[in-house]
């Protein structure tokens, strides 16, 4: 009976302590023979990445990741100029980034995408709205140090690092007049403000390339107190109609969002094409995001 229960429930039936000692049963007996070697405890303060690998395997793994990045750039009609040296550069920048991986900063895998998109576009101007501790700001500044960079937030007191070559503006992006100077200039919005409003504002200021974070669809919205609704995913899917409501629970609080077409500012008609930013956790072991790359007309 015990073996049958193990196979159907996936967990061993509790046994008296003395029976366990006699039969030598442990919770891991169903794993049969383990090929994982124990190397001992981690030292106090020892930095640990999600994994390490032998050098040859690491290079093969990185090359596989570069292939994923390049495939997305092709799909998004961006310059396909990224190679292994760019990934190595990103990893070096990531290791120096004082805010990377901190609580509620830009997900680490999205910082990788921002680095690669900036490298591919080589913009004259990069705008970030919603800086917080500066993880993504640090990443994009280091991706292409030649571009002008504008950082917008209503409070810069959380910043972990300041660059002399960044123009910090402590106000809402919507109240400013910074404009694109070239066709490859980029805006990154991580401010939890209506995606559609930001698209309209960027379009009116001449920007063609956008990355927008916090763009959940129905199955992802429960992770947010302040999703940037209506989000890109909501307007491009075509399934939302006026009055459609979404309810969810966030940290014990019931929330509701009701879709209204007047809140979209005609953003769908301004988009040439857009693409959800792919997940990279399989390769990095780190956090992904609900973000979109958007190309405007």
Question: How should each PLM-predicted stretch be described?
Answer:
Residues 1-186, 193-297:
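A short alpha-helical cap/connector motif
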């Amino acid at each position: 009976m015990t073996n049958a229960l193990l196979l159907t429930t996936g967990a061993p039936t509790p046994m008296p302590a003395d029976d366990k000692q006699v039969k030598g049963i442990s919770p891991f007996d169903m794993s049969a023979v383990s090929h994982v070697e124990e190397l001992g405890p981690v030292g106090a303060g020892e930095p640990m990445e999600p994994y390490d690998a032998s050098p040859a395997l690491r290079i093969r793994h990185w090359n596989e990741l570069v292939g994923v990045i390049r495939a997305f750039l092709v799909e998004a009609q961006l310059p396909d100029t990224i190679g292994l040296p760019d990934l190595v550069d990103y990893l070096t920048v990531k290791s120096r980034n004082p805010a990377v991986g901190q609580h509620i900063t830009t997900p680490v895998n999205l910082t990788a995408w921002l680095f690669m998109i900036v490298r591919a576009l080589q913009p004259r101007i990069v705008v970030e709205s919603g800086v917080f501790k500066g993880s993504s700001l640090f990443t994009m500044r280091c991706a292409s140090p030649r571009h002008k960079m504008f950082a917008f937030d209503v409070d810069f007191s959380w910043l972990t690092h300041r660059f002399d070559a960044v123009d910090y503006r402590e106000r809402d992006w919507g109240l400013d007049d910074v404009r694109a100077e070239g066709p490859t200039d980029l805006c990154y919005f991580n401010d939890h403000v209506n995606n559609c409003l930001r698209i309209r504002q960027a379009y009116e200021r001449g920007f063609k390339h956008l990355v927008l974070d916090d763009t959940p669809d129905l199955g992802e919205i429960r992770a947010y107190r302040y999703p940037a609704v209506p989000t890109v995913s909501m307007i491009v899917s075509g399934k939302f109609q006026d009055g459609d409501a979404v309810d969810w629970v966030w940290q014990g609080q019931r929330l509701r969002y009701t879709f209204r077409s007047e809140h979209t500012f005609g953003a769908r008609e301004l988009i040439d094409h857009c693409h959800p930013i792919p997940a990279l956790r399989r390769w990095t072991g780190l956090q992904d995001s609900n973000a979109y790359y958007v190309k405007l007309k």
